[in-house]
Amino acid sequence: MTKILAVASEVFPLVKTGGLADVVGALPSALKHHGIEMRVMLPVYPAVAASLKQAKPIHHYDDLFGGKVRILAGQAHGLDFLAVEAPHLFDRPGNPYLGPDGKDWPVNWMRFAALSRAAADVGSGRIKAFVPDIVHVHDWQAALAAAYLNFAARPAAKVILTVHNIAFQGHFPASIFASLGLPVEAFAIGGVEYYGGVGFLKGGLQYADAITTVSPSYADEITTPEYGMGLDGLLRARRSVLTGIVNGVDTTVWNPASDDYLALPYVARNFVQRRQANKRAIEQRLGLEEHEGPLFCVVSRLTGQKGMDILVLCLDDLVGQGARLALLGSGEAQLESDFKAAASQYPGRIGVVTGYDEGLSHLLQGGADAILIPSRFEPCGLTQLYGLRYGCVPVVSRVGGLADTIVDANEAALDRESATGIQFAPVDASSLTRAIERATRLYADRKAWNSIQKAGMKTDVSWEKSAARYKQLYQKLLQNR
């Protein structure tokens, strides 16, 4: 059986700030059906410790980045874990990356270098309890493992790096390099050096045996200056080992037929009536008036990348068309303020909940008519996949994974009954306004709208196809050993 060590800074359901956690939490069970054993390595944050009380130590360091560290092996929520217990690094309040003040921990470089170093020690066979064939690292927080493994003294596992969002790169001052424990030759343009500093993601891209990102379109986009965030040149040079594989959805967690967060679960044959009960629950929760027009929802970080500043400019038109908006999200203070102001301006028509609420995110997908996703760039996106599964029609910008996963409701697609949503381009307020107008017109034609919903609900958004693609990639790497 092929053995994989997945390494990430967050894993659902133990700890989650975004879609990365969903992906890393769902992939092991999907791969198990393909005869692949995957264990997941993550840090022991306070939120994680309670779930790993039965874990047993398999390795220890007397001093790793300034303190004692243990690697624990255990199980939780059906997943097999190797957890890096380093109280001096990970036992602190806030989310995995930010302190209570909302700022990055100054020692984040040290925290995630420790995670990467531990992963490399497992991948090199130094820790005998689990010897993987491949170390599959996710994003900059785990990317430095590729550099450590490149310089390992013994034959090491192959390394795959998955980039979930190239905007987050882990760029730190050159002064930290001496503390990383890498040989001096690693601080070079062909190594971890990046614009005079240390780039964790850049080093991972340089040393990984294979690189994946989370959709074919995004794999193409990040090789261009517009989307590559300064790493496009390196990615063009490594294009032959770069693959785009669309994420899947954990269909046991996201299942409208058995979702406890819904007021009334439903299946394809009764979704029209039952989704109305969920819409009423949303209206009551957010103080929205009943109305014959469509109810749009947003479940998103409130940032410029997600196009939320563009949506703010469209709210007058949205309400003017007889539509309503239910928004769940948090992020930039100005955007939170803008949406709250809009809710005050249009009581009963716009409802806003700031923060994150897993249950409400499910209810919005299960009762809103459409979900707005106007991202400036979107590596894959999961909310549009949840929307497909729940019959909440995605209205998306034509970028990255959104372009790959949504079939636009143009005339030909509507005739074929293959349309699953609405795409728009370019990513600006006038295009989004026109997309909202299209959605509102289509919603008035209930036969056409129900056809779009049904086609979306029939779409296979599970991990099955994606897991098969990863299996092919793993096999290809191991053939070249």
Question: What is each PLM-predicted segment?
Answer:
Residues 1-481:
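Catalytic cores of nucleotide-sugar-dependent glycosyltransferases that transfer UDP/GDP/TDP-activated
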